[in-house]
Design a protein with these regions (language model features):
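A glycine/serine/threonine-rich, flexible loop-to-helix segment
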Residues: 55-57, 187, 199-214
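Active-site loop-to-helix junction immediately N-terminal to the catalytic Tyr of the SDR YXXXK motif
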Residues: 112, 160-168, 180, 205-208
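Active-site helix of classical SDR
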Residues: 132, 170, 178
Length: 214
């Protein structure tokens, strides 16, 4: 079986505009690649504009699509609002928000500082909240329907897990927000979904598991 074959037809996402937070590398980059291959226009965000620009250039050459890099720290609502305005100026609309920006520490919890714990909560939970709220307010105020928010969570958002407590806490919050807004915003034509891909090899994951040379 050829697992490289697309599940969706060519141009399935033609004329769609998607925002991918944490889109410069890893899972975000992989999802952005697929969206571009399916015909979507994609805005990718993170704090590292150089990485974003390199990724956007690479993916546009690879797919022939349009990828817009925007520096944005999702922990700050004003930056999220600015990012949204830049996307609207470039593409005129947004159809999908993909909350993928994340962080994690693999560590006994008692060894973490309060600031380290807060950092993960702020990126994952507060960042997802900021982006969801900004896009939701925009769509609702404009009366735009058939919109989607897709949140990336983890399997331990349901089960909990030792040594990743800040991430587990934040992802459980994102899951609760997703379920709650799925009910509240359904009347506005906004779909809320969350997926938990499970573990897979990315540079970010390997750097945390193998932080030094063996």
């Amino acid at each position: 079986m050829d697992f490289s074959q697309k599940m969706l037809r060519d141009n399935a996402l033609k004329d769609k505009v998607i925002i991918v937070t944490g889109g410069g590398s890893g899972l975000g980059k992989a999802m952005t690649t697929y969206f571009l291959e399916l015909g979507a226009k994609v805005a990718i965000t993170s704090r590292d504009i150089e990485k974003l620009q390199n990724t956007a250039t690479e993916l546009e050459k690879q797919t022939g699509g349009t990828c817009l890099p925007i520096a944005c720290d999702v922990r700050h609502y004003d930056q999220v609002e600015s990012m949204l305005q830049q996307v609207l100026s470039a593409f005129g609309k947004v159809d999908v928000l993909l909350n993928n920006a994340a962080g994690n520490f693999i560590s006994p919890t008692e060894r973490l500082s309060a600031n380290a714990f807060d950092t993960i909560i702020d990126i994952v939970l507060k960042g997802s909240k900021n982006c969801t709220l900004a896009l939701g307010k925009h769509w609702i105020n404009k009366g735009e329907k058939n919109k989607t928010v897709l949140n990336i969570v983890t399997t331990y958002a349901w089960t909990g897990s030792g040594y990743v407590v800040p991430s587990a806490t934040a992802k459980a919050g994102v899951l609760a927000m997703t379920r709650s807004l799925a009910v509240e915003w359904a009347k506005y034509g906004i779909r809320m979904n969350a997926i938990a891909p499970g573990p897979f090899p990315t540079k970010g994951a390997w750097d945390r598991l193998l932080p030094g040379e063996l």
